[in-house]
């Protein structure tokens, strides 16, 4: 075993939370190392930083969503703009190569940032060995060596893995999880997706745009229960109109492979009737589970929940002093930016500062077309809490920029406290909703009122004017409706 190194903080995991935490530690002058053992190998076969988000999640999915959207624009929308395109085809291997190049470039960028901020980047499997005077002992194992480290503080940032579905074995050839669905080399004629959550909808959107017949099987009786009900209904209407087939209240019972290579997916529908469908590719997108096993957390007595999450307080402290956990391994939404915020907070706390995350002001986004974005409370949550509120809505059919873009689908919905007018929630369905939700997030973070938003000058013509109009609708009334 190699000689010990002594650190101020060791971060286990170089995903969104872990690498940002490590960089912030370096900025604060802490002696920091970050360990990564993920299976997403770089061209040299070494573990690559970035975690799920960079390697098989946020970034590659957005690359494919962008490519597939460009393809659909050419085929379905170009003529409306006076553009005539004949015979356009999709080179799927070239599309995948573009995606891979983006991932590689960003992974190299993270390693550069580690060097810039004096973060020791260690590639190997971290195992917690136990306590030592004033800290903890951790072994980092590679195929040919083991290095022991001591550290005053420990940050668990090991992310999550796709949830397995009993009886459905993922091979990432015909039966895929998110990683496999982002790496197909041809467009399947028929694709079935188990799970109508964010991952299922985004992956389904990619391959539907390229020509696949997409059927989504969902055990719940409705789409996107975490969304505002108005938003969920509108999303279902729009995606159905685009050609996605949804089957709700369906429970998968088995999978069979036919001699022609097709897959037969058996399920029981909402009425309890046995049914089945045939597909060429199956995507399993039934959620994710925290990655906490094999780390040695039990060696220190770190408490976990019944669902396997590390139990933490508001500042991501675990039950063991000096041990923190962030990102997908702790409570809350599995979002890259939430993990990043927690990483910054934890390092500032370790450095003696007042790190903080406002969990009421973390935006969520679904990158379908149109996009869906929200921050703050839904109308259902306000009703359940007994909070008196007012609602303002504004449709993009009355927005000049949306008309010019050729896509007027969706709306903005603003929820404000009935007494104080404080903005409690903002929900958007629109092209570029992901770029508009920032204003709403800032409004909630700084406790702005709907009137505040309504009195701020918004550039014209823009899509985000609709946020102002929806805010005005709560009070004196929208100006353009």
Residue ranges and their predicted role:
Residues 2-7, 23-187, 215, 220-224, ...:
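Glycine-rich flavin
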Residues 3-17, 187-197:
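Beta1/beta-strand and adjacent pyrophosphate-binding region of the FAD-binding site
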Residues 10-12, 126, 148-159, 193-194, ...:
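Short hydrophobic core segments
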Residues 12-49, 54, 59, 63-70, ...:
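Flexible, glycine-rich terminal cap/loop adjacent to redox cofactors
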Residues 22, 26, 204, 208-209:
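Gly/Ala-rich phosphate-binding loop of Rossmann-like dinucleotide-binding domains
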Residues 171-188, 276-349, 435, 454:
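FAD-site-proximal beta/loop scaffold in flavoenzymes
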Residues 259, 294, 301-303, 404-410:
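Short loop/turn motifs at secondary-structure junctions and domain boundaries
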């Amino acid at each position: 075993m190699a000689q010990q190194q002594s650190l101020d903080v060791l971060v286990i995991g170089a995903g969104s939370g872990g690498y940002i935490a490590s960089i912030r530690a370096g900025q604060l002058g802490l002696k920091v190392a970050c360990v990564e053992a993920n299976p997403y190998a770089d061209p040299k076969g070494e573990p690559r930083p970035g975690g799920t988000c960079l390697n098989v999640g946020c970034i590659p999915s957005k690359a494919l969503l962008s490519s597939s959207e460009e393809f659909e624009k050419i085929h379905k929308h170009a003529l409306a703009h006076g553009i005539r395109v004949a015979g356009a085809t999709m080179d799927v291997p070239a599309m995948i190569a573009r995606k891979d190049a983006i991932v590689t470039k960003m992974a190299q960028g993270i390693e550069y940032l580690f060097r810039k901020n004096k973060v020791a980047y260690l590639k190997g499997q971290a195992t917690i060995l136990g306590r030592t005077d004033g800290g903890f002992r951790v072994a980092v194992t590679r195929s040919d060596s083991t290095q022991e480290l001591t550290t005053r503080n420990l940050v668990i940032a090991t992310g999550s893995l796709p949830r397995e579905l009993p009886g459905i074995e993922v091979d990432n050839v015909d039966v895929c999880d998110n990683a496999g669905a982002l790496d197909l080399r041809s467009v399947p004629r028929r694709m079935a997706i188990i799970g109508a959550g964010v991952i299922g909808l985004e992956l389904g959107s990619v391959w539907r745009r390229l020509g696949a017949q997409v059927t989504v099987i969902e055990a719940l009786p409705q789409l996107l229960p975490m969304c505002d009900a108005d938003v969920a209904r509108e999303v279902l209407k729009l995606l159905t109109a685009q050609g996605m087939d949804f089957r709700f209240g369906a429970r998968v019972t088995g999978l069979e492979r036919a001699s022609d290579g097709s897959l037969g997916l058996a399920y029981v529908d909402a009425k309890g009737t046995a049914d089945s469908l045939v597909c060429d590719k199956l995507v399993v997108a039934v959620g994710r589970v925290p990655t906490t096993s094999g780390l040695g957390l039990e060696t220190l007595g770190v408490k976990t929940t019944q669902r396997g999450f590390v139990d933490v307080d508001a500042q991501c402290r675990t039950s063991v002093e000096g041990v923190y956990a962030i990102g997908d391994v702790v409570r809350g939404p599995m979002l890259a930016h939430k993990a990043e915020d927690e990483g910054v907070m934890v390092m500032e706390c370790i450095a003696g500062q007042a790190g903080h995350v406002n969990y009421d002001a973390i935006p969520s986004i679904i990158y379908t077309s149109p996009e869906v974005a929200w921050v703050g409370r839904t109308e259902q949550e306000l009703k359940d809490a007994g909070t008196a509120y007012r609602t303002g809505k504004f449709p993009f059919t009355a927005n000049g920029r949306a008309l010019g873009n050729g896509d007027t689908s969706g709306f903005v919905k603003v929820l404000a406290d009935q007494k104080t007018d404080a903005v409690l929630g903002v929900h958007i369905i629109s092209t570029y909703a992901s770029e508009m939700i920032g204003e709403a997030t800032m409004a909630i973070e700084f406790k702005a009122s709907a009137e505040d938003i309504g009195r701020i000058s918004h550039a014209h013509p823009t899509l985000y004017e609709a946020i102002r109009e929806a805010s005005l609708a709560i009070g004196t009334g929208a100006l353009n409706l």
